[in-house]
Amino acid sequence: MSSIITLLTYYWLIIFSIIGYGLLFNKIFLRSESQNLGFIGIYGIFSLLLISYISSFFLPHTQIFNLVILSLGLINFFINKVIFDKELKKLIFIFGFLIIFIFISKNHDDFSYYHFPYTHLLTEYSGIIGLGNFTHGFKTSSSIFYLSSPVSYTHLTLPTTPYV
């Protein structure tokens, strides 16, 4: 039971961190005061993807890196939380409902073939280029791998649920 509570807490922290990065992206690059939480979430995912793509050449996405990335997004979220308190209630309701589907879903059939190994390599090593020569599954890297590596919870002792 405690592992499910830990997992749920981590999911909420990831969501709030993504929104924090979206707010930062919106403020710096778009110079907009938009309060549309959907667009801010997309901006946050884009920001995390950009950070992940660039940092994977220089740093492995270790526990410390993930903690720093998560913390920076959370700090920015809590600094700017007042901007959209009404939208925040909608987010909590919608994500609270959708989290049910996360728990009843199953892994894709090729998760153990290349989804998990590629994400695991991103968390262990930096500058991994040419992995397509080793196995067919690594020839085309997906942005999902790079999005899941900075928010992976490999440092937590949880049951084997690969959802991030």
For the regions a language model picked out, list residue spans one by one.
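Membrane-embedded, hydrophobic transmembrane alpha-helices
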Residues: 1-84
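Conserved small/polar residues in nucleotide/adenosyl-binding loops
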Residues: 154-160
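Cytosolic catalytic cores of cyclic-nucleotide second-messenger enzymes
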Residues: 164
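Transmembrane signal-anchor helices characteristic of membrane glycosylation enzymes that use polyprenol
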Residues: 76, 87-110
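Juxtamembrane membrane-water interface segments that cap and precede transmembrane helices
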Residues: 1-3, 142-153
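Extracytoplasmic catalytic/substrate-binding loops of multi-pass membrane glycan-assembly enzymes
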Residues: 105-118, 124-147
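Membrane-interface micro-motifs in multi-pass membrane enzymes
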Residues: 7-14, 60-66, 110-113, 135-142, ...
